[in-house]
Curated annotation (Swiss-Prot):
GO biological process: appressorium formation
Lineage top rank: taxon: Eukaryota
Comp. bias regions, Polar residues: 37-54
Protein name: Appressorium protein ROW1
Signal sequence interval, chain numbering: 1-21
Chief location bin: membrane
Compartment annotation: Cell membrane; Secreted
Gene disruption: observed consequences: Results in a thickened cell wall with altered glucan composition, and leads to secretory defects. During infection, decreases appressoria formation and plant penetration. Decreases virulence on maize; double knockout of ROW2 exacerbates the effect.
């Protein structure tokens, strides 16, 4: 009866461990499979005319895809483009996944904003059409910016726009080391947007009273070590979020504080318009590149020591702990049963314990990641950025941990059950 009870206990432990490894929590404890697909609301997309003002949506009325497919013919007007939207805009709430293809970004506060980056490893210029949102919080159903990636951030509120600027090691979100980067914006070469269908919301527009506000004009420059994101509203939104200087980088387009090691929120004055100098307009590619405008002044600043969520590290730690606990329990039970059995059964138990240990170790390995980077993050013609360095984070390891753990737990449990059956 004792051995039968042991077998039943081992089966129960296996089932419980498997369920724990696969179950989507949706509470920030681990990557949630629900964040890897859109919500399938099947709400219609409004009409769209190229180079005309785009439709806006209340957040609750978003279509599955803002742009979808077949908006224009590929290569229309001699320009490349016309490809379908690769991600989705109706994203799961209050959860996250490093395989998410959510293309709805947010800029709400110093602790709650998103940046655009490649969905798969590649330069910003190569991957801007299919970029996805990476956020500092798990509220938006996106991928997470790993803790330690952002090494300085400066959030500024004005009456006409809100922006966040800073430095970091963005090899952790699949931007190659040394990539000077480029611009994400809602237009692109064919007005489908970079990324196609990418949209931005904010709760920081004073006129929206804290409700999500659809941002029609925004700009986000990204490189391997520098970022800037601005969301504009009002009559001068297009001019204050200009998108024609895509190789000029952050410091030329959005002069601001990029100091590393500082995380602050400030009120700010309105900056001068990009490319406008005493009534004349600079065009990218002109023989002489003018200097960047001075950074506007700011006031009423408050700071914190850093920003982070702890979710990727917590998820990895919890998953490893779960495997170690269930494996230890199975090995202990098998050893107890073995000591009361014959020498032959005892030998089998020792083999089983070894197999369990081996399988657990193989289920917790990490994937590949990019190296660290330092240097300027601006495009040609811009001033040199603050240097930054640091070990890159593996953005795919956390996303695949649940499936890896399920396999390793399953193998360990099967071996333990086999040993118990042999003893019977």
């Amino acid at each position: 009866m004792t051995k039968l009870t042991l077998t039943v206990a081992l089966v129960s432990a296996l089932l419980a461990s498997g369920a724990s490894a696969q179950q989507p929590t949706g509470t920030g404890n681990g990557p949630d499979p629900r964040a890897t697909t859109d919500l399938n609301r099947n709400q219609p997309t409004k009409s769209w005319t190229q180079w005309q003002p785009k439709a806006t949506y209340a957040f609750s009325q978003l279509p599955d895809q803002y742009m979808g497919a077949n908006r224009i013919e590929s290569g229309e007007g001699g320009q490349p483009g016309g490809e379908p939207q690769s991600g989705y805009n109706t994203c799961a709430r209050n959860t996250w996944n490093q395989d998410s293809k959510c293309q709805t970004a947010w800029i709400n506060s110093l602790e709650d904003f998103c940046l655009w980056a490649p969905a798969e490893y590649g330069t910003v210029g190569e991957k801007e059409r299919s970029g996805v949102a990476y956020c500092t919080t798990d509220r938006h159903g996106t991928r997470l910016i790993p803790d330690g990636t952002i090494q300085g951030a400066h959030f500024v509120r004005t009456r006409d726009y809100v922006q966040v600027t800073g430095v970091g090691d963005f090899t952790s979100i699949l931007i190659p080391d040394g990539d000077d980067g480029g611009e994400f914006d809602p237009h692109g070469a064919d007005d489908l947007g970079n990324p196609i269908g990418g949209i931005v919301y904010t709760t920081a527009n004073p006129a929206s009273n804290g409700e999500p506000f659809f941002v029609s004009e925004w700009t986000n420059f990204m490189s391997y070590n520098q970022f800037c994101l601005r969301a504009c509203w009002g009559e001068r939104a297009a001019a204050q979020c200009e998108h024609i200087y895509d190789v000029m980088g952050c410091r030329w387009n959005i002069p601001a504080n990029y100091e590393p090691g500082v995380f602050e929120t400030c009120d700010g004055d309105i900056g001068q318009l990009q490319g406008i100098y005493s009534g004349s307009t600079f065009r990218q590619g002109d023989p002489v590149t003018p200097p960047a405008h001075p950074a506007p002044s700011s006031s009423q600043c408050s700071s914190v020591s850093t920003i982070g969520h702890g979710l990727l590290a917590r998820s990895a730690s919890a998953s490893t702990s779960s495997v170690e606990t269930s494996s230890s329990s199975a090995a202990s039970s098998a050893a107890t049963d073995s000591s009361a059995s014959t020498n032959s059964a005892s030998s089998m138990t020792r083999v089983t314990n070894s197999a369990v240990s081996t399988n657990v170790g193989s289920g917790t390995g990490s994937g590949s990641g990019s190296g660290s980077g330092s240097g300027s993050g601006s495009g040609s013609g811009s001033s040199s950025g603050s240097s930054s360095s640091g070990s890159s984070s593996n953005t795919q390891g956390a996303a695949s941990s649940a499936s890896s753990l399920t396999i390793s737990v399953g193998l360990a449990g099967l071996v333990a059950i086999g040993a118990a059956a042999f003893a019977l």
